[in-house]
Regions:
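Flexible "cap/lid" loop of the alpha/beta hydrolase fold
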Residues: 96-130, 169-176
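Short beta-strand/loop motif that positions the catalytic acidic residue
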Residues: 186, 192-194, 198
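Short alpha-helix in the alpha/beta-hydrolase fold that links the catalytic acid
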Residues: 202-212
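Catalytic active-site module of serine/aspartate enzymes centered on a nucleophile-bearing elbow/loop
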Residues: 219-266
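Active-site glycine-rich loops that stabilize anionic/oxyanionic intermediates
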Residues: 9-12, 196
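Conserved alpha/beta-hydrolase
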Residues: 24-49
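Conserved acidic catalytic loop of the alpha/beta-hydrolase fold
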Residues: 60-76
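Gly/Ala-rich beta-loop-alpha elbow adjacent to hydrolase catalytic centers
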Residues: 79-84, 88
Length: 266
């Protein structure tokens, strides 16, 4: 049975994957959704009482935690959203997984885009004047940037269910050495997924990320979904995205006996 590990991104926790875990479990996959450090629990409780040390959380600490969760499994597939998508790409590059899906992924190697939404949101999060003060997510910001394709009322419901506060240092680290990946090396299958109306990670940046992979002998695919925002995994129509990914997994025959190359080749 193929194992799937779902990795959430900033301002979310494993709660955001509940529908996906059910969907892929019903398809016969063995699914898990580990929390980042300081992100386990009910999102509202985490918002009301932010964990001590949240503002100091680093990408390296998150990666180490997720890598540890993956290490106890049998070369799973990893599906990650946003920063979770970058973590998925790093796990793939480091040879820890048999395949990866990066949804609305933060791009490696400090790749940038001149989209105004991307610039604005990145600047707010990484503001150096804020030091280690966490980013406090609120319903208005969640609707304006994260769930911009939803109505204000629907976004408010999703905010209550899934939103958390987060560490500025995570995105800062993504832009530094911790976010670097050697894109010239061979890798096992990778799918990058983008949302047309994403205000946080523009589809153009996801496509740029896709085109930066240089090894023509490795499977690297890209799919953009129309009318989707950064909340692509939770907004109406998420089932279409999940079904496409399921089809891609089947097409690439994901199990540990059908790897493109042995780990020793990495």
């Amino acid at each position: 049975m193929t194992q799937i590990v779902f990795v959430h991104g900033m301002f979310q926790n494993p709660k955001s994957w509940d529908n996906w875990v059910r969907y892929f479990s019903d398809k016969g996959y063995d699914c898990s959704a580990p929390a980042w450090p300081l992100h386990d629990g009910d999102p509202k409780a985490l918002r009301d009482n932010p964990p001590a040390g949240l503002g100091e959380l680093s990408l390296d600490a998150i990666y180490a935690s997720i890598k540890s969760a993956v290490a106890g499994l049998d070369k799973p597939v990893v599906i990650g959203h946003s920063v979770g998508g970058l973590i998925a790409q790093k796990l793939l590059a480091d040879g820890h997984v048999s395949g990866a899906v990066a949804i609305s992924s933060v791009a490696p190697n400090a790749m940038l885009d001149f989209d105004w939404g991307f610039i604005k949101n990145s600047a707010i999060i990484t503001n150096p004047l804020k030091g280690d003060e966490p980013v406090y997510m609120d319903a208005k910001t969640f609707h304006g940037s994260f769930a911009n394709t939803l109505s204000e009322e629907h976004a408010a419901v999703e905010f209550e269910k899934t939103a958390t506060h987060d560490s500025r240092n995570v995105l800062r680290d993504c832009m530094g050495s911790s976010g670097k990946i050697d894109l010239s090396r061979p890798h096992e299958p990778l799918l990058l997924v983008a949302g047309e109306k994403d205000e946080i990670i523009p589809a153009d940046l996801n496509e740029k990320n896709f085109k930066a992979y240089e090894n023509t002998g490795s499977v690297t695919d890209f799919r953009e979904f129309p009318n989707r925002g950064h909340y692509i995994c939770g907004e109406p129509g998420w089932e279409e995205v999940a079904a496409y990914i399921d089809g891609w997994l089947q097409q690439n025959r994901f199990d540990v006996d059908n790897r493109i190359y042995a780990p020793s080749a990495i």
